[in-house]
Amino acid sequence: MNFAHSEVAALDQNTMRTLCEEYVANNYIDPETSERLGVKRGLRNPDGTGVLAGLTNVCDVVGYKKDQEGHVIPTPGKLIYRGVNINEIVDEAYRNDRFVFEEVIWLLLFGSLPNQEQLDDFCEILAEHRALPEGFMDTMNAPSPNIMNKLQRCVLGLYSYDEHAEDLSLENILNQSINLIASMPTMMVNAYQMKRRYYDKQSMFFHLPKPGQSTAEHILSTYRPDQKFTHEEAKLLDMCLLVHADHGGGNCSTFTTRVLSSSGTDTYSAIAAAIGALKGPKHGGANLMVNRQLKDILKHVENPE
């Protein structure tokens, strides 16, 4: 079966135009009405600041302050994990030349930085759970031109391999979450390889995880055809993982997780929905715009370095 050329049936253009006109005519609420009734459209205040939607002691994002008149004043950004400014973590990482993403996972989950024994044990747990369940490649075989879409399906697919998928005890949810943290890079790389094969018409490569690698090293070694990467590349990716680990509990994808989990649904459904939110161009999709901007700078700016 040629997945790349299979298409979803579409209505003819005239029919769709008529239906859309009918829909728009009867499904519109003007912004003035929302403002008059105090509805926070997009969970934003009129000045663009976020709406308080919950409390968390896991992460805090500081990007502005307000003066006495309530005007928003931009300030140098701060990202604080469990009371620790990530700049301190970054300084520590470069001072001692080590990878810190695994430490940050522990910090976010358990509230404090791990000691060496805890870190070693945790890294071993992650390494043991990088591999996907036996038979899971059947799920991977249906490709997608969008890797985020494929990740959603992969996460939902793991439900079928979990005998306790609906168990909402703390022990089971934590176990599922750690397994997802460990296996997500593997699913991501495999989704990319399937996209290369079916949509980019290039060769795909599947490499087994190597013992003793950090998450950043694991991604690079399984992503590259020759499994080669520099230490500098791995450290840079480690930093990227660090700064994207959490953004305060109020961002779109985290808020989505909280909405779904509040209904009592399973872990896989909640995380898959969060990935769908992260896929949106107004949230995680902004990274693609940054990448395009960097490429444009390299192409059109003389001496960009």
Please provide the spans of the model-predicted regions.
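Hydrophobic alpha-helical bundle cores within soluble ligand-binding/oligomerization subdomains
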Residues: 2-305
